[in-house]
Design a protein with these regions (language model features):
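N-terminal secretory signal peptides
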Residues: 1-12, 25-27
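Peripheral, solvent-exposed domain-edge segments
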Residues: 4-6, 10, 20, 218-223
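Membrane-topology and secretion signals of cell-surface/extracellular proteins
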Residues: 21-22, 77
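Generic hydrophobic alpha-helical segments
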Residues: 24-25, 89
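Beta-strand-dominated extracellular/periplasmic modules and repeats
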Residues: 36-197, 204-223
Length: 223
């Protein structure tokens, strides 16, 4: 889509479609569910060298299609969604969630990533502003590996112009995680908090996947 609005794709229209395809409403947390005890925050991880140094013309939350193009990116279509919460279990509204990742051939949208085969139809970066219940949503591709790294998606969360978290998420159960030096140093708790299940969505013609990852950040000044 030819728009840089973080709320470009209507969140609820997409979620209603997914619910209709057999996904339960339990994919989202009830606000304050864990408010009686502090939650473990999503562990901070390196931003890495490939945060886009030149933003694409399109920075919305649909990474599969750039601008008015009718040619989608190559890869397993994945719907990544979840809730941004603070450690009290309270939803964080108006949080800017950014993601960036390699395309199907393992190449980033970055001028210094000169490996061949970058998918010109893959946006490579997207952003979304959480709603009043702290929810976010992206349509992207299932992450793939490249030399030295297990498949992963980078994420950053910013609240009122303050970067609250920089992290990464991984495919739960992927054997390549065991050899990834960043994943290994997270420890068991950190690994659990950043491992995401990519589950097939019944009824989709292209075998689309649903991935739910709740992101826990530290307290903001308002908290």
């Amino acid at each position: 889509m030819n728009n840089n609005d973080p709320l470009q794709i209507d969140y609820w229209d997409r979620r209603k479609m997914l619910f209709g395809l057999g996904l339960g409403a339990g994919a989202f947390l009830t606000p304050g569910l864990y408010a009686e005890s502090l939650m473990n925050p999503t562990p901070k991880q390196t931003e890495g060298p490939f945060y886009p140094d030149k933003m694409p013309l399109d920075t919305d939350n649909d990474l599969l299609v750039i601008g008015d193009s009718i040619t989608p990116a190559v890869g397993e279509v994945s719907h990544l969604s979840g809730t941004v919460l603070n450690v009290k279990g309270q939803p964080v509204k108006n949080a800017l969630v950014e993601i960036w990742q390699v395309g199907d051939k393992g190449v980033y949208l970055h001028t210094k990533d000169n490996r061949p085969g970058r998918d010109e139809n893959f946006q490579g970066y997207g952003r979304f502003l959480t709603d009043s219940k702290g929810r976010y949503y992206f349509r992207t591709v299932k992450p793939v590996t490249y030399p030295g790294r297990a498949p992963h998606i980078h994420v950053a969360v910013t609240v009122k112009n303050k970067r609250m978290l920089t992290s990464q998420c991984y495919i739960n159960g992927d054997k390549r995680n065991e050899k990834d030096f960043i994943y290994k140093r997270l420890g068991k708790v950190g690994q659990k908090l950043t491992s995401v299940n990519f589950k097939p969505i019944k009824g989709t013609k292209t075998n689309e996947l649903d991935a739910v990852w709740d992101i826990i950040i530290g307290l903001t000044p308002e908290d």
